[in-house]
């Protein structure tokens, strides 16, 4: 509902939220529940394959169409998505990914901008939808330069009221649907 009916092929969505709120778990659930016959690649730079696999098993999300990759090199991630015939690529998180040609460390402003721009180009040319997980600052904004939010098609925030067991996904930018939608 927040995305206006689903993830659009070739689109790039950025989802941010506080540490530990469940961004990785939410997107693992999205990938595992996508249409049968569609191939998804979940690329993690934050956890080992064993950790992600364990969470997927705990949630009952094992799916033959879901591939896992522990990798921070953007070129390797993009090649793996192409090779897998993925229709959806999830990058967890943009702050851990780097493009080797830049020489800056992962999380640096130049890396964040270049990696996001390359993911956008990749999505638009391949038709593969990309969902990027982004960390948030203490103030609640997605960490990194504001240009990240301008480059992507949708910006979502995953949040919770203090003391509540419920989580909310809120769209603040969506080129394919309404904003200020909640789910």
Can you describe what each PLM-predicted range is?
Residues 120-183:
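Phosphate-binding/switch region of NTP-binding enzymes
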Residues 2-10:
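Phosphate-binding P-loop
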Residues 1, 68-72, 138:
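Short gly/ser/thr-rich secondary-structure transition/capping motifs
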Residues 10, 18-21, 25-121:
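Conserved inter-motif catalytic segment of the P-loop NTP-binding fold
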Residues 2, 15, 52, 92, ...:
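Residue-level signature of catalytic and energy-coupling elements of molecular machines
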Residues 3, 57, 124:
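Short polybasic/polar patches that bind polyanions
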């Amino acid at each position: 509902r927040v995305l206006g009916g689903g993830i659009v092929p070739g689109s790039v969505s950025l989802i941010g939220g506080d540490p530990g709120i469940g961004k990785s778990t939410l997107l693992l659930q999205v990938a595992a529940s996508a249409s049968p016959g569609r191939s998804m690649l979940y690329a993690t730079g934050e956890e080992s394959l064993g950790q992600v696999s364990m969470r997927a098993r705990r949630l009952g999300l094992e799916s033959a169409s879901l591939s896992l990759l522990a990798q921070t090199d953007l070129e390797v991630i993009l090649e793996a998505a192409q090779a897998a015939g993925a229709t959806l690529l999830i990058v967890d998180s943009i702050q851990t990914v780097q493009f080797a040609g830049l020489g800056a460390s992962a999380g640096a402003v130049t890396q964040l901008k270049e990696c996001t721009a390359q993911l956008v180009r990749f999505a638009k040319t391949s038709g593969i939808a990309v969902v990027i997980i982004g960390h948030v600052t203490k103030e609640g904004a997605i960490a990194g330069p504001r240009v990240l939010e301008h480059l992507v098609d949708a910006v979502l925030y995953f949040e919770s009221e203090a003391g509540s067991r419920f989580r909310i996904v809120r769209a603040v930018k969506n080129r394919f649907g309404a904003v200020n939608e909640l789910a």
